[in-house]
């Protein structure tokens, strides 16, 4: 059972890494839409269109049996559409992340950080409230985090100052749990944890693995790994090598996506 995974860029590799470690014999195909990153400042219509193009490319070209939307923005806006048009399971990152946060929070005060589009969608707020109506939820858009990660600035002084600028006031609300509502953000996890060691940091990529375990997977495959991008990116290659090793990156043309 090959699995297709897509994101707007680098961040979804954090999900790819967790899935690859848990399912070493399952074929994985990853598409990073680096030509159009970030999705977080795009309109809902555009986000859905990009997501349909990426998912359709993986489904039609590699016959994947499940799609993982390794992008919180795309999960927030395009999950229902993809489930309607594709005859295979489609897994987003919002529900797994929300469920994990509810499990680990002791004081029921949960912070959510994400792109402007993800926060505006209220997807985490609504999902969390559906799980526990007594939760106190504090949300914060952190639009500069994605460019930081895409540049590879994940643990330098600029990263620390930017994290503090966004999160100091959020932490003062008394939250004990913080959902990283963007798959780019786990690359800043060590910086965030270093500044706020008392927080439970929720990375939905780990929770996604548990959801995949509920799907019957064909483990008789070769464990093939393929990574595609829509534009050349030195930062992508650098972080790819750090996260998942020396897997060859293949560039595909946007016209190949848009023609589907």
Swiss-Prot record:
Record key words, sorted: Cell shape, Cell wall biogenesis/degradation, Isomerase, Peptidoglycan synthesis
This protein's name: Glutamate racemase
Binding positions (substrate): 7-8, 39-40, 72-73, 183-184
Family membership noted in the UniProt record: Belongs to the aspartate/glutamate racemases family.
Active site: 71, 182
Catalytic EC class: isomerase
Molecular function GO terms recorded: glutamate racemase activity
Listed pathway(s): Cell wall biogenesis; peptidoglycan biosynthesis
Organism: Sulfurihydrogenibium sp. (strain YO3AOP1)
GO annotation (BP), single: peptidoglycan biosynthetic process
Catalytic activity: L-glutamate = D-glutamate
Top-level taxon of the source organism: Bacteria
E.C. numbers: 5.1.1.3
Function summary: Provides the (R)-glutamate required for cell wall biosynthesis.
């Amino acid at each position: 059972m090959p699995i297709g995974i897509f994101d707007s860029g680098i961040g979804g590799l954090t999900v790819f890494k967790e899935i690859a470690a848990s399912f070493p014999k399952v074929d994985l195909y990853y598409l990073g839409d680096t030509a159009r990153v970030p999705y977080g400042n795009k309109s809902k219509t555009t986000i859905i269109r990009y997501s349909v193009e990426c998912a359709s490319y993986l489904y039609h070209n590699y016959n994947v049996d499940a799609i993982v939307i390794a992008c919180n923005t795309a999960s927030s806006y395009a999950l229902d559409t993809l489930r309607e048009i594709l005859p295979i399971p489609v897994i987003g990152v919002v529900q797994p992340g929300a469920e994990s946060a509810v499990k680990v929070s002791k004081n029921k005060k949960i912070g959510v950080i994400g792109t402007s589009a993800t926060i505006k969608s209220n997807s985490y707020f609504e999902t969390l409230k559906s799980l526990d109506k007594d939760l106190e939820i504090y949300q914060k858009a952190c639009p500069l985090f994605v460019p930081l990660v895409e540049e590879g600035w994940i643990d330098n002084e600029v990263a620390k100052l930017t994290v503090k600028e966004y999160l100091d006031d959020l932490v003062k609300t008394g939250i004990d749990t913080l959902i990283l509502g963007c798959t780019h953000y786990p690359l800043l996890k060590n910086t965030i944890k270093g500044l706020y060691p008392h927080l439970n940091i929720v990375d939905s990529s780990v929770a996604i693995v548990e959801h995949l375990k509920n799907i019957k997977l064909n483990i008789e495959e070769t464990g093939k790994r393929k990574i595609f991008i829509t534009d050349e990116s030195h930062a992508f290659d650098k972080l790819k090598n750090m996260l998942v090793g020396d897997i060859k990156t293949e560039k595909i043309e946007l016209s190949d996506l848009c023609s589907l």
